[in-house]
UniProtKB/Swiss-Prot annotation:
Keywords: Cytoplasm, NADP, Oxidoreductase, Queuosine biosynthesis
Pathway recorded for this protein: tRNA modification; tRNA-queuosine biosynthesis
Protein name: NADPH-dependent 7-cyano-7-deazaguanine reductase
Domain of life (superkingdom): Bacteria
Organism per entry: Vibrio vulnificus (strain YJ016)
Gene of this entry: queF
Record lineage: Bacteria, Pseudomonadati, Pseudomonadota, Gammaproteobacteria, Vibrionales
């Protein structure tokens, strides 16, 4: 379990508890989780070593127009990594469900409500796009960039998280390369439900030993943290043990409750070049 799984800030969350589903707009359903919980554990101060966003895709976004006709859309939300809070995913789902039987005058009104409520919960301005389903019909299904490290013939017997698996991972050769793995799996901090993801690591620095990197990523398999926290842990551990000159860690998780979360942390830029979904999303 995470060191902070019993933190008082988590006690009031609806996650892991039986809840009623509201169908009338209710922004009070949103629940924040302080980013400081895991950042204190990672010894991160106010000056973060990365830029980034948490990119959410909202696949189950629906409301009524002013004549009562249901509308459906796909939303994209960009929450800055500098915000005080991340948004707890079950509360996000319940909040979106509250739109289902509520009338709005326009799509723009829905977008503005989302911006206002999510920004208030996160503690910083968020960006929101509300797109029609047809917007996505010509978009590609992509994979991660770079080389996949998953096909290594190695024995693994322990699945307990261990950052020391990265000890000695930095070699002599100086490279610029991108690696990825589809074997990232962790567990929800509260419910212990599995979270499945793929992770892309782009860096410039001493060449990272791929076997050590894969063993490290697999060690998340029984680890309990939220998606965003896992990505920040990967970033800080790579910085600690490998000390690259530049580093980007981008994970794309499978959806749950109509939402997927795609945390992006980088020394180079605050957002990825695209937000195309992958085959498992």
């Amino acid at each position: 379990m995470s060191k902070y799984s019993d933190a008082k800030e988590l006690a009031g969350l609806t996650l892991g508890k039986k809840t009623d589903y509201a169908n009338q707009y209710d922004p009070s359903l949103l629940q924040p989780v302080p980013r400081s919980l895991n950042r204190d554990d990672l010894q991160l101060g106010d000056e973060l070593p990365f830029m980034g966003h948490d990119i959410w895709t909202l696949y189950e976004l629906s409301w009524l127009n002013n004549k009562g006709l249901p509308q459906v859309a796909v939303g994209e939300v960009y929450i800055p990594a500098t915000s005080a809070n991340l948004i707890e995913s079950k509360s996000f789902k319940l909040y979106l469900n509250s739109y289902n039987q509520t009338r709005f005058d326009s799509w723009e009104e829905v977008r503005q409500r989302l911006i206002t409520d999510l920004s208030h919960c996160a503690g910083e301005a968020v960006e929101v796009a509300v797109n029609s389903v047809t917007h996505y019909t010509q978009q590609p299904i992509v994979t991660m960039e770079g080389e996949c490290i998953d096909e290594q013939d190695i024995d693994i017997s322990s699945y307990d998280f261990d950052d020391r698996l990265l000890e000695g991972a930095a070699g002599e050769e100086w490279v610029t390369e991108t690696l990825h793995s589809h074997l990232l799996k962790s567990n929800c901090l509260i419910t212990n439900q599995p979270d499945w993801g793929s992770v892309e690591i782009r860096y410039q620095g001493h060449k990272i030993d791929r076997e050590k990197l894969l063993r490290y990523l697999v060690s998340f398999r029984e680890h309990n943290e939220f998606h965003e926290q896992c990505v920040e842990r990967i970033f800080t551990d790579l910085m600690k043990y490998c000390q690259p000159e530049s580093l980007t860690v981008f994970a794309r998780y499978t959806r749950r409750g109509g939402l997927d979360i795609n945390p992006y942390r980088s020394t180079e830029q605050a957002k990825p070049d695209h937000n195309h979904r992958m085959a498992r999303q």
